[in-house]
């Protein structure tokens, strides 16, 4: 499973990605620090699940 984590707080984003990568069915976790970066990543790297911060800079 491929995931995207979009979170503007880098420490929280890094920790969440590390935890997700420990799951055996997770093969890759993409990271985005803002909404624009998340959209750019999704245009070229399809994911199964996107985990998005509700209050994040565009």
Question: Which residues fall in each region the model found?
Answer:
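Non-catalytic signal-transmission and effector/linker regions of two-component phosphorelay proteins
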Residues: 1-2
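Receiver (REC) domain active-site loop signature in two-component systems and cognate sites
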Residues: 56
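Solvent-exposed polar/charged
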Residues: 22, 43-44
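Two-component/phosphorelay signaling modules centered on CheY-like receiver
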Residues: 10-30
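Short acidic/histidine-rich motifs immediately flanking catalytic phosphotransfer sites
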Residues: 45-49
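Helix N-cap/capping motif at the beta->alpha junctions
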Residues: 31-40
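Active-site residues of response regulator receiver
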Residues: 53
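Conserved acidic carboxylate
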Residues: 7
């Amino acid at each position: 499973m491929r995931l995207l984590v979009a979170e503007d707080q880098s420490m929280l984003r890094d920790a969440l990605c590390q935890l997700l990568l420990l799951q055996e069915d997770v093969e890759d976790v993409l990271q985005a620090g803002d909404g624009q970066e998340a959209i750019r990543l999704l245009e070229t790297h399809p994911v199964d699940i996107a985990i998005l911060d509700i209050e994040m800079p565009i």
